Amino acid sequence: MTNIEQSNEKRQRSQAVTQTEWEQYMAEKILRLIRHELYMDFRYMDVALSALSYQPKEGIDTLGTEGDHLFYSADHLLRVYPKNPVYLNRCYLHMILHLIFCHPWLQGSRNAADWDLACDIMIEYLIDHMEQTSVQRITGLLRRKVYKRLESVG
């Protein structure tokens, strides 16, 4: 056992933590890993990627923000990350891009559902065309059709 491992083991024994505390710790570790992976592909977004402070919020099945905090469910992150880390990378970047483009604040008198859908489609279009490893996924037929139609409109 290395000195670092011994030190970590000693620290863990002296700091009894609850299951909930451990889950929060691991969830925030996952969020830092996601942010780091995105940073490796999008170095120019370093300030934006680190602008939100993490805030646990149980009962949500995705990531969320109001512009200051990144809301997450530890249970959701711990369940999804091992199976599909790219999905979480995309969710994180999706939120950041919404904030960069000021989507939450530019709705005005537009229909909220239509505005949200239009902004989501635009953000996903951008992410799908970034062609970076951290967010790359297979583009399904429906997405390709929607993108082709949008591109033809102009």
Functional labels for PLM-detected ranges:
Residues M1-N89, I96-G154:
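Short, functionally important secondary-structure microenvironments
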